[in-house]
Amino acid sequence: MQDESRCSHLLVALGVAVALACRALPWLLQPQLALDDGAFFFAQNYSEFQWGAIFRPYAGYVPVGTNLSALLLCRLPIAWIPVAFVLAAMVMMFGCARTLLRPAWEQVAPYRIRVAMAYGLVVIPFGSNLEFTSLAYAQWPQMLWLFLLLMEPLRATGRRRRHELGRCGLVVFLAIANPLSVLLAPLGL
C-alpha cells in the first residue's frame, strides 16, 4: 500500500515513542520507584544477584518477565535504576503499539486506522499512568502485546520467515513471562 512506506513506519514509530515519552515525562524527570517497584522488585533484587529470583511470587502469582527485568536492571548504578524501570515499562507499551503497524495487519484494517489505534494506545488515558511507568503493572502491556501477536494474521508469503520466527519467539517469551497468559492464550488461539 502507498501509505505503508518504510519512512512512514519509522515516522509513526518515532511519533508513538515521543507520545509515550510525553506521557511518562514526570517519571523520567523525577525518577522514583513506583509502589511495588521499590518495595518488592528493587528490594528483593538489588542486594544480591540470584537467578532463582525470577521465580519469586508476587501478589499471588509468579511474574517471570517482570522478575527477570528487575533482576537485570538492578545491576545498573543505583541512580539509573528508577529510570530504567520506567523505560522497561515504556518499551512493553511501545511493543504493543508497534505490533499494530506490522504489515500482516493490513488484512485487518487500513494503515491509517492502525496508526490511529497505535497512537490511541499510548495517548488515551487509562485509569492511571502506572501501566506505562511501573514494572509492577507490566503484566497488562505484556498481556495486550501477547494478545495482539496471537491475533496477528499470518503472512501469505514465505519470504519473511525470519520475521515469523522472531514473532514466535516473542510469543513464547511473553506466554512464559506473563502469568495472565494462561487466561489469554485460549482467546487468541
Can you describe what each PLM-predicted range is?
Residues 26, 73, 99-105, 123-134:
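Juxtamembrane "helix-exit" motif on the non-cytosolic side of transmembrane helices
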Residues 6-33:
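Transmembrane signal-anchor helices characteristic of membrane glycosylation enzymes that use polyprenol
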Residues 87-110:
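Transmembrane-helix motifs of polytopic, lipid-linked glycan transferases
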Residues 26-34, 47-75, 79-89:
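Membrane-proximal lumenal/periplasmic loop motifs of glycosylation machinery
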Residues 92, 109-155, 176-177:
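Membrane-interface micro-motifs in multi-pass membrane enzymes
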Residues 163-187:
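Membrane-interface alpha helices of multi-pass inner-membrane proteins
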Residues 1-6, 153-166, 189:
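Membrane-interface junctions at the ends of membrane-embedded or membrane-associated helices
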